[in-house]
Amino acid sequence: MAAVINNAMLEAILAEIRPLIGRGKVADYIPALASVSGDKLGIAISTVDGQHFAAGDAHERFSIQSISKVLSLVVAMNHYQEEEIWQRVGKDPSGQPFNSLLQLEIEQGKPRNPFINAGALVVCDMLQSRLSAPRQRMLEIVRRLSGVADIAYDPVVARSEFEHSARNAAIAWLMKSFGNFHNDVATVLQNYFHYCSLEMSCVELARTFLFLADRGIAPHLEAPVIAPIQSRQVNALMMTSGMYQNAGEFAWRVGLPAKSGVGGGIVAIVPQEMAIAVWSPELDDAGNSLAGVALLEKLTQRMGRSVF
């Protein structure tokens, strides 16, 4: 399976993609992210049979941002019954920008899915209700999944996002007005921004998300992370809603479940085979890594992998 993959192959693909750097734009609405150099490019792959590959800036940590929304959903799945989650947040793509208020108003405070901001805030609200220390719990889970003990939040990024949180606060208050938000808004926003500020490398992300390629099982942990059916459900949500309003185009070009973040990272899953993490900070108009999407497209073509 993984015989076609090696570090030299990944380096060659990076060289083909590198000319795209300069065509996107680093996220500038979060000041702490705006200072990141746009010329970074990295990829890492972890396979279910225990192989690991990396190239470029794969060992450099960056702000994972909305990739964390997958992890917060997984934590919620371990603390809530299925119906408790999905009566408060939907399972459908939104077709709208990830921070849209319009759709939320029309649909009476129930977000379309857990990977847009409104949906992730509902999930964080649920974690606040059920966990005594949700920020510490998330850190423990990420460190356990990755096998890396020093993964941490970036307090500068978290503070920067909180200081520019008017729109997310508006989303939370709108949901509160519809009865779909139960805790203190500022407290939940702080948790949400800390999750987004997690600093991880491509290598760490690929290992962390490997459980989604293996029916909810992380190879180095005794107990399953989530049940096989839940792993399938998370992959389905990533396929339909993980790439903001460009999920359809990404499915067309790449054909894998994936989740992106405005820090320039993307995690993609080849079910039963591998987890892939890429990073390039310059974004396209939808907020996805421009070179990162192209890198995944080239890689999946080279490997002949797709869920379709």
UniProtKB/Swiss-Prot annotation:
Gene3D superfamilies: DD-peptidase/beta-lactamase superfamily. This is Glutaminase. NCBIfam families: Gln_ase, PRK00971.1-1, PRK00971.1-2. Signal peptide: none annotated. It catalyses: L-glutamine + H2O = L-glutamate + NH4(+). GO terms for molecular function: glutaminase activity. Belongs to the glutaminase family. The keyword Hydrolase applies.
